[in-house]
């Protein structure tokens, strides 16, 4: 019965957590919707927003209420264990408060002053310096470093660098640094779901990009070679937007809130535009005009009139065009014609959309709205082509622009006459037909003679019988070989030349098209990432919360020890610590590390050096510690010689006694270090000393294995309390680098009987552990050592 009751309570707790999570997601979604509506109101005619001031005030008050209700709990959660959900909600809540107040103030000022440009400048923060440029500084154990943040990827890079340098950073310093990053994320991640194009650089890969390349087929290429071509879609994620410029025409008849007379007027105006477009749309294709001219020339001829050479050429070209089986404007079955219209067509579509919108606004609202893009139309017109593409449009989806750009590339490539003749022989026939018609027209105009009057004078190369005239030199040369033999030779040579030319052209065409396809395939991913609408991904929030919790756990561990442990031994102020240090150091240095233990000790070293951001060794399907460290060092671009040094660090001096580097109470002391790389090496040496000393302690004194853990490795239960486990916890703090927890197995939530030892010296800490585990043995061994040291020689 007790087991069933416990399971029922546990199930109820799980259901309660799920319900609370769902409510938080619902609130976050509503705040995101509110932020999106605020962004729309910023860009709309402020006269419309003025009519919504009362509703906007209610929303601002609701944000105040949510802030008062939720922020205390969110701050408490932040101190316990920050989650991506609570942090994202906290960002959105703070940003919604700022944006709502800003829009309300701008609308109130517009209501009093009525300046459109001032409203847009204030509501959209168009004045002043760029808010997305920030310089941040950080104090490490090896000195001060600074970096500039311009993109979201810069924030991710800084977080990866913090993760790698976590063992040479003080928690208080990082906490202030994380506040600076939080302010930057508040301006970006907190502003809504849509990312401004100037905020991301997709050519910079993120940690997820690198991890994806590590688990996918490499085709013989190295990871670093492939990552250069990687387009990041994790910091920001692109989405497909459906844009239909006819939505207004389709939905207007169903707009019941519009008066019937105004709706009828608007529909009538739209119908007039549609009919006018059908009447004025003409076929401007050059192929159609050429075909009409050719048909007129051929229809003017009859069997009673002699056919000139040019007329015969026109007839033959018409024959080949008709026999090709493809009608004009028939879709071609290749990649090129599967794309959308060209850029000019997109511009025309945008202008048509603006015309329709203006007519409907005038009919329904009796005025044309002064939206942002209309008030600043002159500035938008002066933008260059690249900025206009990034700006996008209201009538064309980003994919339409992308396909138009790609089609323009193909059209430019295929405008070469050679490619046109090979790919589209019927179009080559059209070009030839156009050339013949131009020659006939110019010749007839120059001689002031009608081409089809029957006198046979239009063809210079036609004789009186209507046949081709033979060149005299050609006739003389045929006398030696014979007419038929010479013609056969000319025909064979011409055929051979044509065949060779065609084979060469086909080979050239295949290579050029293959190169173009490869180039466009590679560039298409970048175009899609740049021009499509992007929303914020979860990478930054996940990375920020992981690092924040990792550094916060150091201070929280010390606070929890002071509150929960019944017995605290602080060796930092003990008078007997020096004797204990000398005794334990001398006892351990008599022994050597077993080489068979080095692989496991090396993995422990990797686990302690790795930061909190990459937790592959703590997943449900855990990987070795070197895998997590591999992602940590590769994502910061650690130099190869340092990676090699780190990989072999535990094997150096394993048979000697020079692995001890710290002085008495000098563990994790960096007072003599003046650069970051030297600080890293010193931290590695301290960690190596801790691992070797602990391993020798376990083997010499037979007290069982001592577990060495990071401060962020302790789990937290649903009440926010630590689930304590015995072990030595390294905090990477110079004031209290080592904390030993003992007796956790006998402690409960009601009674805390644990013992905690705080120290800045490895050997005095180990002696205190020996005293706790085997006090009689510790005193006996120490007395024997003192006696032997004072015995006469």
Swiss-Prot record:
<keyword id="KW-0426">Late protein</keyword>
<dbReference type="GO" id="GO:0042025">
    <property type="term" value="C:host cell nucleus"/>
</dbReference>
<comment type="function">
    <text>Component of the molecular motor that translocates viral genomic DNA in empty capsid during DNA packaging. Forms a tripartite terminase complex together with TRM2 and TRM3 in the host cytoplasm. Once the complex reaches the host nucleus, it interacts with the capsid portal vertex. This portal forms a ring in which genomic DNA is translocated into the capsid. TRM1 carries an endonuclease activity that plays an important role for the cleavage of concatemeric viral DNA into unit length genomes.</text>
</comment>
<protein>
    <recommendedName>
        <fullName>Tripartite terminase subunit 1</fullName>
    </recommendedName>
</protein>
<dbReference type="GO" id="GO:0008270">
    <property type="term" value="F:zinc ion binding"/>
</dbReference>
<keyword id="KW-0862">Zinc</keyword>
<dbReference type="GO" id="GO:0019073">
    <property type="term" value="P:viral DNA genome packaging"/>
</dbReference>
<dbReference type="Pfam" id="PF01366">
    <property type="entry name" value="PRTP"/>
</dbReference>
<keyword id="KW-0479">Metal-binding</keyword>
<comment type="subunit">
    <text>Associates with TRM2 and TRM3 to form the tripartite terminase complex. Interacts with portal protein.</text>
</comment>
<keyword id="KW-0067">ATP-binding</keyword>
<feature type="zinc finger region" description="C3H1-type">
    <location>
        <begin position="206"/>
        <end position="234"/>
    </location>
</feature>
<keyword id="KW-0547">Nucleotide-binding</keyword>
<feature type="binding site">
    <location>
        <begin position="697"/>
        <end position="704"/>
    </location>
    <ligand>
        <name>ATP</name>
    </ligand>
</feature>
<dbReference type="InterPro" id="IPR000501">
    <property type="entry name" value="UL28/UL56"/>
</dbReference>
<keyword id="KW-1048">Host nucleus</keyword>
<keyword id="KW-1188">Viral release from host cell</keyword>
<keyword id="KW-0231">Viral genome packaging</keyword>
<comment type="similarity">
    <text>Belongs to the herpesviridae TRM1 protein family.</text>
</comment>
<keyword id="KW-0863">Zinc-finger</keyword>
<dbReference type="GO" id="GO:0005524">
    <property type="term" value="F:ATP binding"/>
</dbReference>
